[in-house]
Amino acid sequence: MKILLIMSFFLAIGCGQKEKIKLAEQKSVTVQKPVQLQNQPKRPDYAIKAPDFTLKTIQGELFKLSENKGKVILLNFWGTWCRPCRREIPDFNKLIKNYQKDGLVIVGITLKRSSYETDSSIADFMNDWDINYTILTDINNYESQVVTANYGQAIGQPITGIPTTLIIDREGYIVKGYVGPRSEEIFYKDLKPYLSSES
């Protein structure tokens, strides 16, 4: 009789725990499920929330990703020393000129190769290349490396090659990624569904 009572006690506890775990799993799925706005293009199933960050523009102003919700963001990890990155600059200039009015924001996160690369030398590079979109750098030291590591973790693979470029939709989800340079035409084809809809 005692054994039956003990077994039924553990069975009741076990069921209760299973129900709690099941309920917790349901809650976490509900919380993490992206909200799809009616006038947005269908977000891919693999889309993930872009990690928020704060970095500094070359002009010295703070840039916080989450303050750009409602915009379509082309996030580019690049370096002034990277030749393939340089190839994309004219295409990014054209894209921002043509589609900023539609809500496009292009943001370059600068990965410095050495301590000799300063905000001043990056500003000179921007002037030489007529860069007309936002370029970000560290606030103090190494924040851009932390952001790069966080994005590598978010997309499931470290960002070791640059340029690496991500499209972030108006609700802040990473919907497309590229490793290596791409043309204006390729970027526009993938950006177009997100630019033509507004939040």
Task: Kindly give the residue locations of the regions a language model identified.
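N-terminal targeting signals for export/organelle localization
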Residues: M1-D52, G177, S199
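A short beta-strand-turn-helix
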Residues: A47, D52-I73, I96-Y99
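Conserved redox-active cysteine motifs that mediate thiol-disulfide chemistry
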Residues: K69, F77-K94
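Structural microenvironment flanking redox-active thiols in thiol-disulfide oxidoreductases
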Residues: R87-I131, N141-G152
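Thiol/disulfide oxidoreductase modules built on the thioredoxin-like
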Residues: W129-I131, D138-K192
